[in-house]
Structures are given as C-alpha cells and as structure tokens.
Swiss-Prot record:
Amino acids binding thiamine diphosphate: H75, A116, H117, S118, G148, A149, N177, Y284, E366
Details of cofactor binding: Binds 1 Mg(2+) ion per subunit.
Gene transcribed to yield this protein: dxs
An individual GO BP term: isopentenyl diphosphate biosynthetic process, methylerythritol 4-phosphate pathway
Taxon lineage: Bacteria, Pseudomonadati, Pseudomonadota, Betaproteobacteria, Burkholderiales
Stated name of the protein: 1-deoxy-D-xylulose-5-phosphate synthase
Amino acid sequence: MTTELLDRILSPADLRQLDRRELKRLADELRGFVLESVSRTGGHLSSNLGTVELSLALHYVFDTPHDRIVWDVGHQSYPHKILTGRREGMAHLRQQGGISGFPKRSESEYDAFGTAHSSTSISAALGMAVASRNAGVQRQHIAVIGDGAMSAGMAFEAMNNAGVTPNINLLVVLNDNDMSISPPVGALNRYLARLMSGQFYAAAKNVGRAVLQHVPPVLELARRLEEHAKGMVTPATLFEEFGFNYVGPIDGHDLDALVPTLQNLRALPGLQFLHVVTRKGQGYKLAEADPVLYHGPGKFDPAVGIQQAKAPARKTFTQVFGQWLCDMAERDERLVGITPAMREGSGLVEFEQRFPQRYFDVGIAEQHAVTFAAGLACEGQKPVVAIYSTFLQRGYDQLVHDVALQNLDVTFALDRAGLVGADGATHAGNYDIAFLRCVPNMVVAAPSDESEARLLLSTCYEHPGPASVRYPRGAGCGAAVGEGLATVPLGKGLVRREGRRIAILGFGTLVQAALGAAGQIDAMVADMRFVKPLDRELVLELAARHDALVTVEEAAIMGGAGSAVLETLAEAGVTLPVLQLGLPDAFIDHGDQAALLAGLGLDAAGIERAIRARFGALLA
C-alpha cells in the first residue's frame, strides 16, 4: 500500500497545503492505513472507515487545534488521530502503554474533549463556545455526533440550551450512517447544501424574517412554505426549532461537497447544523456488507476477512447470561428483557429472536431504560435490564428514585464489571459495588464462576425487589454450567477451601485467584457471593477462627466489598487485622485484562505476595 501523501502529513497544517485532488488521493491512502492498522491490532473498524473524508474535511477547513472538534463516543476518531501526529502510535492502539482508542485530552492537544460514553459532544462543545465568548476568543466549536448518539436525551438537552445562548459559534455535524443517499439527494442536494450554507442565503433569510415579523400571518405562511420547500430534499426541520441553521443531508464521502459546505458554515456566526450521510465500512466491501461484525474486530487478515472462530472451550459470562435469560423466559412469561443499544454486547441476540414481543432495545437511553423497567414492574412484569456496569452510572438517579425507593422488582445484569481491557478507563466497571451497596433495598451479587453466575441470576430474579448481578468481560474459568434454574439462600456465602491462620474473603471471579494464592500459604477461602446483604454470620465466624482477614474484589477498594466487611467488624466490636485488595483510587488505562490485573497485584501471585508482605509473621 502506497502512502506517499500520508507520509507528508505530520499535522493538519500539512494537510491544508494540499489541493482538492490530492485530498481525494489522501483519503484513499488514509482509509487503507486504517484498515491495515486495525487488522494488526484489533479495534473499531467500520465506524472509522466511514469517517475518513469527514475527518479530512474538518481538519482541512478548520484551524485545529485552535478550533475545537469534539468527537462524540470517539471510537470513530482513528483518522483524526492519524492526521494529528499519532500515526506511529497506531501500531500499539489500545495496548498497554499505547494510544487510546478514544479521544483523550492528555494524549494530544487536538483531542479537545475526552469521550467514550455517548451523546456528550454537544454539551461539551457548547460549554467551550460559551467559555470562548466570555474570554473574547474567536474560534469555532464543532461537535461530531452519530445518529445513534443523537437518539439520547442529553443531545437534545444541549441543543435546547444552545438555542437560548446568544453570541456563540457552534457547529453540530450529524454523522448519519444508518441511511443511504437516495438518487434525488445527489448533485441537486450538493448545490442546495452549498446554497443554504452560504452567507447570502443566511442574510436574506434573516432580513426576510425581520420584515415579516411585522406581518404575522405572512410570517406564518412563509415559515410553512420554507418547511415544504426544504421537505422536498431534506428531513424535517426539527433542528431549526432549536435555533440551528440546518444544512443537508450531503454525502459524507464526497469531498467536493464537504469542503465548500464546511467553508461556508465556518463563515456563518451562531448555531449551524450539518447533516452528513456516511457508510460504515466504506471502501472495504466485507465491512460494508456486515458493519456489525467489523465494528470491533480482533486481529484479522484483510485479504480474507474475519474467519469463523472455533467455539471457545470456556463460555463467556455474557453467553451464560444470554442462555439463562432465554431459559427463565421459557418458564416465566412475565420476564421482559431490556437493553440500551447493547443487544450483541449484552448477549440478547437469541432472546430477541425467540421472544421478540418481550425484547426492548430502548436505544442509547439508560435513564429511560431503568424507569421503563420500573413502570413494567409496577404492573407485575419482571424486567431484566442488561447493561454494562459503566453505563448504569448514567441511570443512577432512576435506579435510586424510581426503582429502589419503591422497592420494585427489577433485576440488573451488569456486564463488563471490573477491568475491561482494551477499552480502558472509560468503559471499566469499577464502581458499581460502591454505588449500589449504599442504596436501600438493593441486592448486590458477585458470582465467582459461570455456574455461580447462573445460580445468582436466578436468585436475584426470584428476589421480590431490586437486585443486581455483576460479572466481568470475557470467558469464565471453565466451570460446568447446569441447565436448571436453582437458587441459593440470599446473602449467604460458602467456604471453598479450609486453611490455617488467614481467611481470604473473595467477591466475584477473583475467588479463583484467591484459591491459587491460598494453596501456597495454606489460607482459608470463602466465596462470599453477595456484597449485600453481606453474610454477617460468616464474616464474624471467620474473624473468630482466624488471626487475619483478606478481602479480594475486582472493584474499587473505596466503598467496596472490603469496606462492607470492615463495617461489619466495627459494628460487632471485633478488632482484627484486615488487608483489602482491589482496584486503587485511580483510573486504569487500557491494556490486556490479565496483564492489568497482574500489574495491580490481583492475580494469584500478586495476592500471595501481598499477604506475605503484610502477614509474613503469621505464615512462619
């Protein structure tokens, strides 16, 4: 693959030296480089192949980094990273010590705002625009947001706020990759986009409105005529109701349309909205045909594409959940499955196919998902909300106010609890234990393996109140998983290994690492199963029988399961040395999950090492 032009681009300043014809050649080189890089490291592919021309046009037209570009979600920012001096870093994308797969302020001055969760870009760009206005700085502020992210309420809250904020420069670019451009939206629409984004059109429209303000009936007629005229070639003018000048849709892969339209919009003050249509996987036929498969692939050969992988010997926790959900739905027709736009990731594909009337993908709307579940529970349904731990943070008020306060029967299946590997700190589920166990009525369960996951899912589902089950990303330890729907006593743990002077209390899958460590130091290991209600009787029994306790969890130490054990001991007046092992008070960067855990001392060797360092005298 030739990269003659790309080799010359060390920053956007170099990009702006190219003519339009060279820009098109560069787009081909950049797209090929993205494909080659991601095939070697893994990462997000389809979305990045779809934003090549848009990334080029934005950096070509706007004076970055002086002008601010905020990429919503951010997994489509690889072309942006390559164009802003991080081409070499793509060799270690999302690897420990390498560059992030998302925009990150500490990584580059061109990353104006860190993103990874959805629908934040317009709010952030609006805040920047107001700050620039207040400081008397002239700059442009651009929020690039996808059609999926635009479905979330936060995006509309931001536009509503922008509509009443005077004297700011804000451009929202809607990257719509969920529709195709029909034939009428070709050359004609390119011309109309350039016309509507031009200064003459904007000035004429403003003058006309000023005059017509004095003739209200004529003003209303003019409004309707304008809407009908625009309706011939564009979507409804919803965004203009928020105060934005709407332009588009235009072909997001046509630089001859993108560049002049963006140049026109740059010259206009106020609120501008550009609707561009792109195609996920653009330029790579396999990704165009199946953008979901190529959304976030691992390493693969671009010449042959992603090959059908052999079924892993060990099931993932997501698969265990998906099978349990279908089995429970067979038995209980009240069960309803809910996901906020994470059907594949949360394991609901089979459930949707088998129970379509009881499956609800509510879109990127975590707040709505939780309260929707609360409404279902009020009427006797049994909702199960399948959600990543990190995304439940976005629905926390609803969990407290709408579910727990009313003690409603809602089960939360929390995938990606703990470290998540390549996606890094933005997607890590480190905080759910701390923010859930403090909520009255809430049950918090943490299974140690695949079999326990099925047992605890059934137990929490049968519990008449709010309950959560947290489990990590990836494969389990290979434990056999039964087909039944048995339950276990609520709030009761069990002893996995007897030992001598030290007792290790494990919460979640780190029980396996604890067992490995215990074998080297003859320690006792308890699988606590529940953080809340905590097995108080077992904790006090172990404290009475041992000289020291160790708590182990793949979650934040502050406020976590270890804190619950300390609170129990303090309440009972028991004084005993306790070592808490878990995730530190820090954001953990991307990298291999196992390597990250080992680096934090949360593998078997690390746990043994920590216990020897703290309680060596007890092991002598």
